[in-house]
Amino acid sequence: MKGGEGDTGEQAPLNPEVDSPAGSATYREFVHRGYLDLMGASQHSLRALSWRRLYLSRAKLKASSRTSALLSGFAMVAMVEVQLENDHEYPPGLLVAFSACTTVLVAVHLFALMVSTCLLPHIEAVSNIHNLNSVHQSPHQRLHRYVELAWGFSTALGTFLFLAEVVLVGWVKFVPIGAPMGKPAPVVPMSQVPPVTVSLSLASNLTPSSASITTSQQPSKACPPRQVCDSAHGPGWQAAMASTAIMVPVGLVFMAFALHFYRSLVAHKTDRHKQELEELSRLQGELQAV
């Protein structure tokens, strides 16, 4: 190959059959034109990316507002409508956990609902304008952290609290059913119990047969209906334990799905950015070679 053949090849038109100068282009002009087209496409893609972020923020705020309104309303109804048995001694930790979980659940979802209510009208107003340059008028870029915080509170933290709320409601509601009133007292001779003079005086007026009937009916109070006296727990405790045993695997599956989903989403975004960087590197190498 001679020395001038390379330059002549670069200056030769890509389409030699076209005789008009406007219809022919050298390789250098072709690469330059491709670079300009890519820069224009990048500007267009940046604008399209801004619109995509706007629509994504709007969708997240809408989803978080609907979810937060539903779950917070359920938590409030659960706290108001739950009926506590006065004659049952609840564990103090159970009532404290139920009250704290309900309060935190309502507070988290109300915060997400407040962010959605404040930001969503401004984003909706900009998205309804049919102008490509109007995307910069939306506050979703500047308040991106609040959008993500509301989305995380509503979908991640709020859902975990809701699962815990369901478990606690089951314990508060079902534990008193069939629960023993207390341990049966040991049998003590009546002669060794001086404080019960009133009951003895009342019992003296009864016939021996009626007194035997009343004494035979007293132990049944310590064992409510639908419960075996020998069992330590009633059917309510078994129902609450069943709901807990079901909800624990559901929570683990939820955590696994959330981690897998966000990991796949991050991997997809990383691959897309990697492909764009490789395209820019290839074009830069072609320009430097020319």
From Swiss-Prot:
CRAC channels are regulated by fast Ca(2+)-dependent inactivation (FCDI), a mechanism that limits Ca(2+) influx and cell toxicity. ORAI3 subunit displays prominent FCDI. Inhibited by lanthanides such as Gd(3+) ions. It is found in: Cell membrane. GO terms for cellular component: membrane; plasma membrane. Pfam families: Orai-1. Keywords: Calcium, Calcium channel, Calcium transport, Cell membrane, Ion channel, Ion transport, Membrane, Phosphoprotein, Transmembrane, Transmembrane helix, Transport. It catalyses: Ca(2+)(in) = Ca(2+)(out). The chain crosses the membrane at residues 63-82, 95-115, 157-177, 239-259. GO terms for molecular function: store-operated calcium channel activity. It is a multi-pass membrane protein. The modification Phosphoserine is found at S42, S45. GO terms for biological process: store-operated calcium entry. The record marks E81 as: Confers selective permeability to Ca(2+) ions. InterPro entries: CRAC_channel, Orai_sf. It comes from the Eukaryota. Oligomerizes in homomeric and heteromeric ORAI complexes. Native CRAC channels most likely consist of hexameric ORAI heteromers, implying that diverse ORAI1, ORAI2 and ORAI3 subunit combinations with distinct biophysical properties can operate in a cell-type specific way. ARC channels are heteropentamers consisting of three ORAI1 and two ORAI3 subunits. Interacts with STIM1; this regulates channel activity. Interacts with CRACR2A/EFCAB4B. Pore-forming subunit of two major inward rectifying Ca(2+) channels at the plasma membrane: Ca(2+) release-activated Ca(2+) (CRAC) channels and arachidonate-regulated Ca(2+)-selective (ARC) channels. Assembles with ORAI1 and ORAI2 to form hexameric CRAC channels that mediate Ca(2+) influx upon depletion of endoplasmic reticulum Ca(2+) store and channel activation by Ca(2+) sensor STIM1, a process known as store-operated Ca(2+) entry (SOCE). Various pore subunit combinations may account for distinct CRAC channel spatiotemporal and cell-type specific dynamics. PANTHER family: CALCIUM RELEASE-ACTIVATED CALCIUM CHANNEL PROTEIN 1, PROTEIN ORAI-3. Belongs to the Orai family. This is Protein orai-3. It comes from Mus musculus. The lineage of its organism: Eukaryota, Metazoa, Chordata, Craniata, Vertebrata.
